[in-house]
Swiss-Prot record:
A cellular component term, taken from the record's GO annotations: cytoplasm
PROSITE patterns: DNAA
Location in the cell: Cytoplasm
Gene it is expressed from: dnaA
Binding positions (ATP): 158, 160-162
Organism lineage string: Bacteria, Bacillati, Bacillota, Bacilli, Lactobacillales
Chain intervals for the UniProt region annotation (Domain II): 74-113
Source domain of life: Bacteria
Chain's role: Plays an essential role in the initiation and regulation of chromosomal replication. ATP-DnaA binds to the origin of replication (oriC) to initiate formation of the DNA replication initiation complex once per cell cycle. Binds the DnaA box (a 9 base pair repeat at the origin) and separates the double-stranded (ds)DNA. Forms a right-handed helical filament on oriC DNA; dsDNA binds to the exterior of the filament while single-stranded (ss)DNA is stabiized in the filament's interior.
Name of the molecule in the record: Chromosomal replication initiator protein DnaA
InterPro entries, per database record: AAA+_ATPase (IPR003593), Chromosome_initiator_DnaA (IPR001957), Chromosome_initiator_DnaA-like (IPR020591), Chromosome_initiator_DnaA_CS (IPR018312), DnaA_C (IPR013159), DnaA_dom (IPR013317), P-loop_NTPase (IPR027417), Trp_repressor/repl_initiator (IPR010921)
Amino acid sequence: MKEKQFWNRILEFAQERLTRSMYDFYAIQAEVIKVEENVATIFLPRSEMEMVWEKQLKDIIVVAGFEIYDAEITPHYIFTKPQDTTSSQVEEATNLTLYDYSPKLVSIPYSDTGLKEKYTFDNFIQGDGNVWAVSAALAVSEDLALTYNPLFIYGGPGLGKTHLLNAIGNEILKNIPNARVKYIPAESFINDFLDHLRLGEMEKFKKTYRSLDLLLIDDIQSLSGKKVATQEEFFNTFNALHDKQKQIVLTSDRSPKHLEGLEERLVTRFSWGLTQTITPPDFETRIAILQSKTEHLGYNFQSDTLEYLAGQFDSNVRDLEGAINDITLIARVKKIKDITIDIAAEAIRARKQDVSQMLVIPIDKIQTEVGNFYGVSIKEMKGSRRLQNIVLARQVAMYLSRELTDNSLPKIGKEFGGKDHTTVIHAHAKIKSLIDQDDNLRLEIESIKKKIK
């Protein structure tokens, strides 16, 4: 009886936090198997769901556990139901029919797919800023056109959108070699259309794009402001594929509703499926990225050096890659194998322009800037008052303290009047969820971050 109450409470919390489509995908499909010795065994039908539950929903398990069991419940995830083979048999049968393409078409040579083989899910570093987008991309790569169609991923430059598009295409071809897949930047699609139009070969163009099983378009914002004929052709291509239940995945530097210069009917179609954002990597993710990028270079990057670098570049992955290139160049010239903080600081001096500004951001500076923005005092932020504007400021400050510093959760909680670390976890998850849904809040936080730095 308690297990049912416990699970229903979790679903209630999840419904408040998640969008409808995410709730249906991540929460409804999950199931609590048992709760014993303060461990909740939770069945997830897909292994990639674990990261979402662990990073985005774990705190609601803790809250529900205290409410129902008066104890801290730890989740344990399983991906096969005990003594239950029915679901796997159904899934296997589904896969057999899903990829039985009809009519049969000649597969596209890999060189013509536009894909880059080096970009896979295996070497994509997941973190809080991209977990939803990665999970959606994985879901699409398992169930073409049955999960989210189109899938629209947006975020700033250098955050991994192109990597994810290629990973989807490569994963599909690994499992379905005869699938017709095409990756192409929007600008190249436009040029291809204009070339075929000029040569009078529009039937060839239509056949190329409208016979695909998977179309991956990068930087769709490039279509904004283009001539009516160009947007009309993409509109018709989109409709032709969608009507045949073929998968479309798009990326952009902004959300569909902020794509100016596009016909409204296109914007509407971009929102038909699922829209996910990618935000800059947090401190832990930046360290993981640096570890992945440096482990095979033949140099010894000390752990404190990686932490130092992670603290200097927080806007995108390209900055981290550029810093690594700067460092390895100096190391090669000086014939150095051990990369210390001093070596790293020297190497990235030009990139940072002023090394004297490479300071750790104190939490009180974050509190000050957030307080100034929302008209809330630091005393109120550290207190326990629950007025809406104070709660928002407090949660935003906690969120930024975790994103912009390497302080531990208990340390952050202490700086906010001795709050428990679970409060920090909840605040971070709450703001992260709101950012994904509210562009105005996302812009507010970006504005605050610029003032902090």
